[in-house]
Amino acid sequence: MARYTGPLCKLCRREGMKLYLKGERCYTDKCAFDRRPYAPGQHGQRRAKLTQYGIQLRAKQTVKRIYGILERQFERYVEKAMQKAGDTRENLIQILEARLDNVVYRMGFAINRRQARQLVNHGHFLVNGKKVNIPSYLLKPNDVVELREKSRDLEVIKKAVEANKERSVVPWIEVDYDNYRGTFLRYPSLEEVTDLPVDLQTVIEFYSR
């Protein structure tokens, strides 16, 4: 399955909720979902009543779209979360939150996860002093993420830092904007990830059928 490259606002409208895929724009009156809060297409305003399967499917799609993950990889994450001891929902969110592209976004070095993925792909970040260009790379507690010296003048990163530096950083991450680095302190608990608009139990049930 190819990665989605179309309009991001259509994904929010399809899921019937803001996914904040465009970063700062989603908080302004330019947000397409605020103007047209219904599904795209000719019959978008007639949202059908979902079956239990449909609810589970939409929840799964929503999480995938928020984190920018394709089906095969997401399925592997769910399998890994199920095999690990403890709360499967928390295991899954910890895997998702440990992805390098997500941590770059959480640190404020990108305006959204898609931009963070591109920046990682292009080799702009170091992990513990070594270049890592794999967005799905899973960080471990106390790993240090740093912007490469030659990348610090990039306009997209300057704009992202300026937009994000006044916002509070999630408690499992520490950021030093003056030195363009941050530390992934620990894995978050399920309750700490407050910006996920779906119940992960619904997602787990989809793959448990």
UniProtKB/Swiss-Prot annotation:
One Gene Ontology term from the biological process aspect of the record? translation
What function does this protein fulfil?
Answer: One of the primary rRNA binding proteins, it binds directly to 16S rRNA where it nucleates assembly of the body of the 30S subunit. With S5 and S12 plays an important role in translational accuracy.
Q: Does the keyword RNA-binding apply?
A: yes
**Under the GO molecular function aspect, what terms does this record hold?**
rRNA binding; structural constituent of ribosome
Q: What CDD domains does this protein's entry cite?
A: S4
Q: Does the keyword Transcription apply?
A: no
**Native organism:** Thermotoga petrophila (strain ATCC BAA-488 / DSM 13995 / JCM 10881 / RKU-1)
Q: Which SUPFAM superfamilies match?
A: Alpha-L RNA-binding motif
> Domain S4 RNA-binding spans what residues?
98-161
Q: Which InterPro entries match?
A: Ribosomal_uS4 (IPR022801), Ribosomal_uS4_bac-type (IPR005709), Ribosomal_uS4_N (IPR001912), S4_RNA-bd (IPR002942), S4_RNA-bd_sf (IPR036986)
Q: Which Pfam families match?
A: Ribosomal_S4, S4
* Membership in a protein family: Belongs to the universal ribosomal protein uS4 family.
* Gene3D superfamilies tied to this protein: Ribosomal Protein S4 Delta 41, Chain A, domain 1, RNA-binding S4 domain
Assembly description: Part of the 30S ribosomal subunit. Contacts protein S5. The interaction surface between S4 and S5 is involved in control of translational fidelity.
**Gene Ontology CC: one annotated term:** small ribosomal subunit
Highest taxon of source: Bacteria
UniProt KW keywords: Ribonucleoprotein, Ribosomal protein, RNA-binding, rRNA-binding
Name this polypeptide is given:
Small ribosomal subunit protein uS4
